[in-house]
């Protein structure tokens, strides 16, 4: 297998491939790929003993820069349980899966800097994940039937070249390269008497999720389905009930993605350093979730863009 030679302008900035450009603002992507990940790589190499350094300090750095959350963990739990139950045959019953899910949740350490918000969110997710899991299974069954997939297969790793781009494009479809699962969770709220705001199922797929599956479609032109599941039910979208999942629509979305990736490559090429690259984009610190990170890391980002001293 031959690996493509990466251009120096990409290596210098640790921006080695493209992925869905609509998953978060470009400012957050640059900060993560070009600033945070190199620091995490060094910290992990110290912790693993591959590089000399202070292991305690490295562990502290990993904790600070690793931006996990209760909802993200809950989504991974459901995905893992489905893989174990439907694909790898590691669990005999749904009850076994639920017990395994509780063990995974027990390993998660909530954020310590958000006044208990993530800890409260974790309780909500733990109390509802069994229902979300069961509904996700039903939604997956329906999607598998609609897509006429005989044998369910797990996550794939797509890495492919794109005409007009110097860097490859990466995507990881959940099932068979054709079915994407999205779980939605009730949200903790201290202003609601119950302490939680229910999550509804969407009437149409989100733009970000459409862009995500358009990347999978671009690789093999296989039909795509998106399954949404919450604690109350599920909803399956295919081209039968969502025109934006039709081939022509996915092609148009893919063209949009490639255009945005091309703009990023132009920025990466024109900037001599990571600092210059950062200065080429306007940060959106008011984004609803992109900058929900450790206060010290947020301050670091604002300093890079010159918003604070």
Where are these regions (language model features)?
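Short loop/turn segments at secondary-structure transitions that flank enzyme active sites
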Residues: 84, 185-187, 230-232
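Non-catalytic protein-protein interaction segments used by genome-maintenance enzymes to assemble
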Residues: 158-212
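Short amphipathic alpha-helical face segments that pack within enzyme cores
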Residues: 77, 211-218
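Short acidic (Asp/Glu) and glycine-rich catalytic loops that position anionic groups and cofactors
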Residues: 54-61, 183, 231-235
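Metal-dependent nuclease catalytic regions and adjoining charged, substrate-binding loops involved
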Residues: 154, 218-309
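Secondary-structure boundary elements
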Residues: 143-148, 177-180, 218-225
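Metal-dependent nuclease catalytic cores that hydrolyze phosphodiester bonds in DNA/RNA
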Residues: 1-172
